[in-house]
Amino acid sequence: MTKREEQGLMPQYVIEREMPGVGKLGPADLKMASQTSCKVLAELGPEIQWVHSYVTDNKIYCVYRAPSEDIIREHAQRGGFPANKIVEVKTMIDPTTAE
């Protein structure tokens, strides 16, 4: 059981999406992709939540909260997004972990 599950929180996942050239997209394209994602999230219901995403040159790394990997794959399929790798976050660390 992860720390989040012990605290009664939804599991958290990092999704790696291979999207060549995505880092060159402009604000309008990113807005459209975000709107598509949010539309699918609304259809799937409140049990899946998009936290945020990191856009790099050729990949997007998304952080989601969801009860399972399956619903994340469903979101990707419905939205037309790749989900090349999905991993569950076991715990988080930051500089305060060193204290």
Question: What is the predicted role of each segment?
Answer:
Residues M1-A42, Q49, D94-E99:
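Short S/T/G/P-rich N-terminal loop/turn motif that feeds into the first structured element of a domain
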Residues Y13-R17, W50-A76:
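Short, well-ordered beta-strand segments in beta-rich or mixed alpha/beta enzyme
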Residues C38, I60-Y64, S68, N84, ...:
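Short amphipathic alpha-helical patches
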Residues P46-H52, K85:
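A short linear hydrophobic-aromatic micro-motif
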Residues D57, M92-I93:
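Short secondary-structure capping/turn micro-motifs that flank functional sites
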Residues A66-M92:
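An amphipathic, aromatic/His-enriched active-site/gating alpha helix that lines ligand/cofactor pockets
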